[in-house]
Amino acid sequence: MKAFNTSWADEVEADYVDGLPPSNEYIEGDYKYVTEYKFNDDGKKVKVVRTFKIEKQIVPKAVARRRSWVKFGDSLLDKPGPNSQTTMASEEIFMQFIGSKEFDQTHETQLDPGKNIAKCRICNGEHWSVNCPYKGTSMDSKTMMETKANAAAAAAVSDPSKMGKYVPPFMKDGGGGSGGKNWGRGRDRDDSSAVRISNLSESMTEADLEELVKKIGPHTKMYLAREKNTGLCKGFAYVHFKFRQDAAAAIEVLNGHGYDHLILCVEWSKPQP
């Protein structure tokens, strides 16, 4: 700010020595008028008139006590209330104090719109897939298995050589050879849609086997080979699917798939003599 030069004689005559007349205030009705003088950026003297509306209101005792506190610093000799020289009046801000339970509910409500932002593809949790605690486990493989199964099933169905005509059981692969000699055996035991799953762990159970193949397609029966004495899994099992394309999808998806720290081997079940 530029300095405002005045003569010593003018300041003595005006009864002020800082180059500015003193501020004054007066009350008229419900309004209070405060007149102040200051220098602008160009070094010119300007007059500022502030108008305040006087309102009476009931305040808490704590607020009334704060107004009677002894002021300090540049406001030591000021009257009760704000001084425009040392205090800047701004907008009134209303605050609402709530308890911890209400805060938790409000916080959860604010987070509701963002729930769909992060969704795990492995466990469908509210976090990114890279941070999923089930990453690399059997639960992580389910999504991959479903994707591969759908692709393999679609490829099997779209194969023109397998659509559009009826294939008798005795003419299917593993159905008992050509002609009608083995028709009875093919009808009683149809292994055309059966697969053999090997390299299973000893702790494998029927429930685990069911969980492993149920995402691929419907099946008619399962057989888990067990030791007679210990009851532990021998390491292989047979699954008969309802549709041959589902069996093909199982081979495509599960063969070479890691399960229970082992690599599965899945192939077509060979016809029993």
Curated annotation (Swiss-Prot):
<dbReference type="InterPro" id="IPR034240">
    <property type="entry name" value="eIF3G_RRM"/>
</dbReference>
<dbReference type="GO" id="GO:0003743">
    <property type="term" value="F:translation initiation factor activity"/>
</dbReference>
<dbReference type="InterPro" id="IPR012677">
    <property type="entry name" value="Nucleotide-bd_a/b_plait_sf"/>
</dbReference>
<feature type="domain" description="RRM">
    <location>
        <begin position="193"/>
        <end position="271"/>
    </location>
</feature>
<dbReference type="InterPro" id="IPR017334">
    <property type="entry name" value="eIF3_g"/>
</dbReference>
<dbReference type="InterPro" id="IPR035979">
    <property type="entry name" value="RBD_domain_sf"/>
</dbReference>
<keyword id="KW-0396">Initiation factor</keyword>
<keyword id="KW-0694">RNA-binding</keyword>
<dbReference type="Pfam" id="PF12353">
    <property type="entry name" value="eIF3g"/>
</dbReference>
<dbReference type="Pfam" id="PF00076">
    <property type="entry name" value="RRM_1"/>
</dbReference>
<comment type="function">
    <text>RNA-binding component of the eukaryotic translation initiation factor 3 (eIF-3) complex, which is involved in protein synthesis of a specialized repertoire of mRNAs and, together with other initiation factors, stimulates binding of mRNA and methionyl-tRNAi to the 40S ribosome. The eIF-3 complex specifically targets and initiates translation of a subset of mRNAs involved in cell proliferation. This subunit can bind 18S rRNA.</text>
</comment>
<dbReference type="GO" id="GO:0005852">
    <property type="term" value="C:eukaryotic translation initiation factor 3 complex"/>
</dbReference>
<dbReference type="GO" id="GO:0001732">
    <property type="term" value="P:formation of cytoplasmic translation initiation complex"/>
</dbReference>
<dbReference type="GO" id="GO:0033290">
    <property type="term" value="C:eukaryotic 48S preinitiation complex"/>
</dbReference>
<feature type="region of interest" description="Disordered">
    <location>
        <begin position="168"/>
        <end position="192"/>
    </location>
</feature>
<keyword id="KW-0963">Cytoplasm</keyword>
<dbReference type="InterPro" id="IPR024675">
    <property type="entry name" value="eIF3g_N"/>
</dbReference>
<dbReference type="GO" id="GO:0003723">
    <property type="term" value="F:RNA binding"/>
</dbReference>
<comment type="subunit">
    <text>Component of the eukaryotic translation initiation factor 3 (eIF-3) complex. The eIF-3 complex interacts with pix.</text>
</comment>
<feature type="compositionally biased region" description="Gly residues">
    <location>
        <begin position="173"/>
        <end position="183"/>
    </location>
</feature>
<protein>
    <recommendedName>
        <fullName>Eukaryotic translation initiation factor 3 subunit G-2</fullName>
    </recommendedName>
</protein>
<comment type="similarity">
    <text>Belongs to the eIF-3 subunit G family.</text>
</comment>
<dbReference type="GO" id="GO:0016282">
    <property type="term" value="C:eukaryotic 43S preinitiation complex"/>
</dbReference>
<keyword id="KW-0648">Protein biosynthesis</keyword>
<dbReference type="InterPro" id="IPR000504">
    <property type="entry name" value="RRM_dom"/>
</dbReference>
